[in-house]
């Protein structure tokens, strides 16, 4: 709508609420870990399942360059069953090329690793290959796993850009630089994948 000039300001967001029924069903399907764990131990436990989450996030998008703007969404792309990790690696390269951003210009990769050993294979592969020399961070130990958790990641990325700092609790390795371009990559149990490129405002 913004690109087609049908609106100037749009409120968008995502909501997911965890109920007792949905928790029981998803637990039976093996989406959650069988035993309670601390969220801070999510990436230490090398087994199946994640931790359940819920959340809501809303953003005011505008086509106007204003001083109070926090960040700019450069690009967004979704994929349904894109294939194996190598196929997703190619998708990421094409996505960055489309938006005239090189890998070296990506200051931070925000990943949707959720602690499920099978689910995280694609992240592990990308972390050792295309993202090998780029600082990485995780976020699902803070919000849990849910279908629209990428909205939490987008909020987190915007706050990183606004405050010029990366919280230590999300860093995979210590960072010394302030990110200007953040690439968010998330997938929901291998089915729905998304890429969001967010940057500081150029105004």
Predicted feature residues:
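Conserved beta-ketoacyl condensing-enzyme motif
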Residues: 8-9, 16-19, 101-133, 181-183
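Acidic, glycine-rich active-site loops and adjacent beta-strand->loop/helix elements
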Residues: 15-19, 76-80, 113-114, 140-142, ...
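Short acidic, glycine/serine/threonine-rich loops at helix termini
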Residues: 21-26, 121, 194-197
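Short hairpin/turn module used for nucleic-acid contact or packing/dimerization
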Residues: 156-203
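Active-site-proximal alpha-helical scaffold in enzymes
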Residues: 1-16, 52-67, 145-171
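Condensing-enzyme catalytic core mediating Claisen C-C bond formation in acyl metabolism
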Residues: 28-108, 133, 181, 189-190, ...
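Terminal domain-initiation and capping elements
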Residues: 3-6, 19-21, 30-32, 36-37, ...
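Conserved phosphate-binding/catalytic loops in two-lobed NTP-binding clefts
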Residues: 131-145
């Amino acid at each position: 709508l913004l690109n087609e000039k049908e609106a100037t300001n749009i409120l968008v967001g995502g909501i997911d609420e965890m109920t007792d029924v949905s928790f029981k069903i998803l637990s039976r399907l093996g989406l959650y870990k069988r035993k309670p764990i601390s969220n801070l131990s999510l990436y230490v436990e090398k087994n199946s399942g994640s931790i359940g989450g819920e959340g809501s996030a809303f953003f005011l998008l505008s086509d106007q360059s204003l001083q109070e703007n926090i960040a700019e969404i450069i690009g967004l792309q979704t994929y349904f069953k894109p294939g194996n990790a190598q196929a997703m690696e190619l998708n990421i390269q094409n996505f960055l090329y489309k938006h005239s951003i090189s890998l070296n210009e990506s200051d931070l990769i925000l990943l949707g690793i959720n602690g499920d050993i099978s689910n995280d294979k694609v992240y592990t592969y990308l972390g050792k290959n295309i993202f090998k020399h780029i600082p990485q961070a995780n976020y699902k130990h803070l919000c849990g796993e849910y279908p629209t958790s990428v909205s939490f990641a987008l909020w987190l990325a915007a706050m990183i850009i606004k405050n010029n700092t990366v919280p230590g609790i999300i860093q995979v390795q210590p960072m010394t630089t302030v990110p200007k371009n953040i690439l968010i990559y998330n997938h929901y149990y291998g089915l729905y994948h998304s890429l969001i490129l967010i940057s500081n405002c150029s105004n």
